[in-house]
Amino acid sequence: MAFEARIAKGPGVEAVFAARADLIERAISEALARGCSGIISFGTAGGLAPDLKPGTVIIASVVSGPLGKIETDPEWSARLFDAFAGTPVSGRAVRGRMAGVAAPLTGEREKSALYRSTGALAVDMESHIAGAIAAARGLPFAVCRAIVDPAWRSLPRAATAGLRDDGTTTVLPILRELLRQPSQLGALLRLAGDARVARTSLVQARHAIWG
């Protein structure tokens, strides 16, 4: 998403984003054509492990999803995790499996089922795509993701209503969804709080990794 890219970008780091799979593939391929030494899937994720709170940072060892099992680069992953030592992220960082999905996973039941079947700590819609491209090009691949919505929380429909295919958001569809079902407001406000915590973790992780 756009806010994730704004956090990630900086000297020596080109950040690309999109919400639709084909647009993600195109954006990554265009970035690779300009030259890069590897790919890091950096951003937010939905929690699957029931003990992980919003703001937990995950450095993935493997990504399981629609494209199979994709291993991350052990050296890059270790360097990312080790960079957190002595920083605010150190107490909130874990290593383990990530899951990839083709559509948003918003329900508590669906999250629980995916956790039971994969053992993944968290889930996103981009890491498996980035990993497959990295593997095809022979490039190092790593994942750094911060949990927004924990495993025990379902997302209201309004949470995804404003997401555009290009990864940006617009407010009007969210407002329309709230007008249709005002009872979603409480859950949306809780999600906003979780998102602030995750964003703080991402900013701290970015500073720890790249300075």
What does each of the following model-derived ranges do?
Residues 1-211:
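Glycine-rich phosphate- or other oxyanion-binding loops that anchor nucleotides, phosphorylated ligands
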